[in-house]
From Swiss-Prot:
SUPFAM superfamilies: Thiolase-like (SSF53901). It is found in: Cytoplasm. The active site is at 114, 251, 281. The keyword Lipid metabolism applies. One of its GO terms (biological process) is fatty acid biosynthetic process. Keywords: Acyltransferase, Cytoplasm, Fatty acid biosynthesis, Fatty acid metabolism, Lipid biosynthesis, Lipid metabolism, Multifunctional enzyme, Transferase. Pathway: Lipid metabolism; fatty acid biosynthesis. Signal peptide: none annotated. Residues 252-256 are annotated as: ACP-binding. One of its GO terms (cellular component) is cytoplasm. GO terms for molecular function: 3-oxoacyl-[acyl-carrier-protein] synthase activity; beta-ketoacyl-acyl-carrier-protein synthase III activity. This is Beta-ketoacyl-[acyl-carrier-protein] synthase III. Homodimer. The gene is fabH.
Length: 324
């Protein structure tokens, strides 16, 4: 017998305002065709003035708790993946904890940029499996619109705001790949690439927030190889394969990266969950947002094996296999 982190429910939240490619094309030198052909993105959501990362996260968490049909007071761990916190400190996770009326247990932020949700999931899973906590909220939430240079057409068209969450419950299972819950997680990073995708500000360096900067070609060049390698690690750890998984829910950064990764791994296109067209790249929020879409539309069902992967600034990257 072993302890697994079983998914009880998921939820998401998107700001009301939708920004289409056409709206961006009216402000900067770009076009809907240019954006769609290179990224697959058609629109993205942008947080309203006064709407913070914590607000998005609280709404997503409430939706996940409702879907799981559990009392918020049963949560004793909150791990929030974000690169756009409300404040330098305290952690945005404690604002979420307070917003949910939870005043016990532990809550903290985890920063791995677009890999943030996979890192948060792996962290919560290890805490639950160790017996330190019993029930966790794992959240990815971002307001990337606040760190974009809206005059840089190579980056401002890519990102959006949003939040998604999972409720994980520690349950005893048989210890095989037939178990429900998180089956394996694999995390990687390589700081030699830190200048290829970064924000040019921070409290220690410039005392400013800064803007996102990216060498797009370099990111694309490394992405597919890194993503596929860490997925192979997950397959080898569990004995599962591209043929035996039910769904592939990748970080929604760019449709070309997703398509190339799926092709290299021989994952059938019909198994790939794509939401990048409607959400853009929401960084740490993208995977739980996509999961919630696929659960709500009936694709992901209890017992399905779901493969997750992400890559972000640093570079950081990771994978997870979860039986729903």
């Amino acid at each position: 017998m072993t302890i697994r982190s079983v998914v009880l429910g998921c939820g998401s939240y998107l700001p009301q305002r939708v920004v289409t490619n056409a709206e961006l094309a009216s402000r900067i030198e770009t076009s809907d065709d240019w954006i769609v052909q290179r990224t697959g993105i058609r629109e993205r959501h942008v947080a309203a003035e006064g709407e913070f990362t914590s607000h998005l996260a609280i709404n997503a968490a409430r939706a996940a708790l409702a879907a799981a049909d559990v009392d918020p007071q049963s949560i004793d761990l909150i791990v929030l993946g974000t690169s756009t916190p409300d404040n330098t400190f305290p952690a945005t996770a404690v604002a979420v904890q307070d917003g949910l009326g939870i005043h016990h247990g532990a809550a903290f932020d985890l920063q791995a940029v677009c890999s943030g949700f996979v890192y948060a999931l792996a962290t919560a899973d290890n805490f639950l499996r160790s017996g330190s906590f019993k029930r966790a909220l794992v959240i990815g939430a971002e307001t990337f619109s606040r760190i974009l240079d809206w005059n840089d057409r190579t980056t401002c068209v890519l990102f959006g705001d949003g939040a998604g969450a999972l409720v994980l419950d520690a349950q005893r299972q048989d210890g095989t790949s037939a178990d429900r819950g998180v089956l394996t997680t694999h995390l990687r990073s390589d700081g030699r690439h830190k200048a290829k995708l970064y924000v040019d500000g921070g409290p220690s360096s410039t005392q400013t927030v800064g803007h996102l900067r990216m060498e797009g070609r370099e990111v694309f060049k490394h992405a597919v190889g890194m993503i596929t390698d860490v997925i192979v690690d997950a397959f080898e750890a569990t004995g599962l394969s591209a043929e035996t998984i039910d769904w592939f829910v990748p970080h929604q950064a760019n449709k070309r990266i997703i398509d190339a990764s799926a092709h290299k791994l021989h994952i059938a296109p019909e198994k790939v969950v794509l939401t990048v067209d409607r959400h853009g790249n929401t960084s740490a929020a993208s995977i739980p947002l996509a999961l919630d879409v696929a659960v709500k539309d009936g694709r992901i069902k209890k017992g399905d094996v779901v493969l997750l992967e992400a890559m972000g600034g640093g570079f950081t990257w990771g994978s997870a296999l979860v039986r729903w």
